[in-house]
């Protein structure tokens, strides 16, 4: 609300605490202004991470982002994103290819996500799920970007084919009540579970049979990386970067395709689960590998 005061406050905090390294994570180009304030406060290492591949805020947001697009390209001393797409979005076209920015994957503590049948059975029982239930899950805030309306349309058709289908929705958000109304209009309220914000996401993913993620856009969705870590098959929109396909167990579908194409893919997923530890370590999506990359890029070879 008060940009000038905010700028001064950042500068003061950095100066008073003698911070040398400052990290700013954002999808907005104007956020690089915070790093400029940090620089004036004495910080010499200005790190910026892009968090998305598209702007939110409609036309006005796009205009503001374009107006300040120069800032994240010249102010940070180190620049990175979770995918090539997200890095190029904030730091300029071909920023990764030209060596102006780096990709540091969204990583997971892989040992926490290795699929375990005992954990699956225990969590399904806790959630009131039966062995016969075919469980779809979606993890994401109730926001236009996550496209819950489309998800509910898809689930309605899945349920028509398999009345043992259950949908788990993890998250909170401003559109939650609107989505509840849509579910009630379909008469699906007994077949959709709102789980809220959780600290047992790995277990919920293990309890599920397929992850459905029809986002309008994403940078690099962490929830899909986590889902793959548990060996869960994922059906996701083709608006999402192909870089997210670590396991080879992802199906990309167009949001413009016939809804039955989504339903067919969901209803015919392979329910077999595999240990993903080796693949994640080799692909540098485990937290230990990524930490060393982060240290190298941010603290040693700044861009």
Could you say what each language-model-derived stretch is?
Residues 22-43, 55, 65:
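An aromatic- and histidine-rich active-site surface loop
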Residues 114-129:
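A short helix/loop element that forms part of the nucleotide-sugar donor recognition site in Leloir-type
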Residues 197, 216:
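Aromatic "clamp/platform" in nucleotide-sugar-dependent glycosyltransferases that forms part
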Residues 224, 233-237, 242:
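Short hydrophobic beta-strand element within catalytic cores of glycosyltransferases
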Residues 272-303:
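A charged, aromatic-enriched C-terminal amphipathic alpha-helix characteristic of glycosyltransferases
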């Amino acid at each position: 609300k008060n940009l000038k005061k905010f700028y001064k406050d950042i500068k003061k905090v950095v100066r008073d605490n003698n911070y040398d390294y400052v990290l700013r994570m954002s999808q907005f180009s104007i956020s690089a202004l915070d790093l400029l304030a940090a620089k004036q406060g004495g910080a010499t290492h200005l790190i910026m991470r892009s968090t998305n591949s598209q702007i939110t805020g409609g036309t006005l947001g796009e205009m503001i982002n374009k107006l300040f697009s120069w800032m994240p390209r010249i102010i940070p001393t180190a620049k990175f994103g979770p995918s090539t797409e997200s890095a190029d979005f904030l730091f300029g076209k071909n920023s990764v290819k030209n060596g102006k920015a780096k990709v540091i994957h969204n990583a997971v503590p892989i040992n926490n996500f290795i699929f375990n049948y005992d954990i699956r059975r225990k969590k399904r029982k806790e959630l009131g799920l039966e062995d016969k239930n075919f469980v779809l899950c979606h993890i994401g805030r109730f926001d236009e970007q996550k496209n819950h309306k489309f998800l509910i349309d898809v689930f309605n058709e899945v349920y028509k084919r398999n009345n043992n289908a259950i949908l788990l929705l993890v998250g909170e958000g401003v559109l939650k009540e609107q989505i509840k109304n849509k579910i009630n209009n379909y008469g699906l309220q007994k077949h959709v579970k709102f789980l809220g914000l959780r600290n047992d996401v790995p277990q919920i993913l293990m309890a599920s049979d397929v992850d459905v993620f029809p986002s309008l856009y994403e940078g690099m969705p962490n929830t899909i990386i986590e889902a793959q870590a548990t060996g869960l098959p994922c059906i996701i929109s083709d608006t999402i970067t192909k870089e997210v396909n670590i396991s080879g167990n992802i199906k990309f579908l167009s949001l413009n395709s016939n809804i039955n194409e989504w339903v067919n893919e969901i209803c015919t997923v392979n329910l077999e689960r595999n240990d993903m530890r080796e693949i994640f370590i080799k692909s540098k999506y485990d937290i230990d590998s990524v930490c060393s990359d982060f240290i190298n890029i941010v603290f040693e070879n700044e861009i």
